[in-house]
Amino acid sequence: MFSDKPLITDDEAAKITRVEELAYELTVGEVMTNKVCYLRPEQTMREALDEFKKYRISGAPVAVDGNLRGILSIEDLIRSLRDGRIDLTVADYMTSNVITAKKEDQVIEALKLFVKSHIGRLPVLDSENKLVGILTKGDITNGLLQALQNDFEAEELIRYRASHLFEDIVSDRSTL
């Protein structure tokens, strides 16, 4: 027994389609977090733990003078604690082969990287390969929601102007 009621309405389908369009339209640079909390390779894992707690993060890029050297995750911190080596350096535990995104990349490309690589964050590099941001799935969600909100506000403004234009036309005719 199938229901005659569709799974989603036409309006809902249009909204889903718009989200997909935005994933192709928006760039990583438009949705990323610009203020990057980063670590230095010579910091100890204890210092990294303090930074993670202070900024309430679960991972951070490792950089020197804006050049990405690696990435450290909460899993790396846990491993150092388990090993009893919390006083070793970030360089000893970081992942050196880092998957990154470019500021100019489309959001859809970053989404594909997240799905394919099972990672929690992407360091974002500029055209000179300097660290300029960090991208999480939450950043993408917030960016898409903000873009949808902007679309909605633009549509409302158009409707408002159109209704007033119609009123102006009607009032001009009544004075003729």
List each model region and its residues.
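Tandem CBS (Cystathionine beta-synthase) repeat/Bateman regulatory domains
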Residues: 1-176
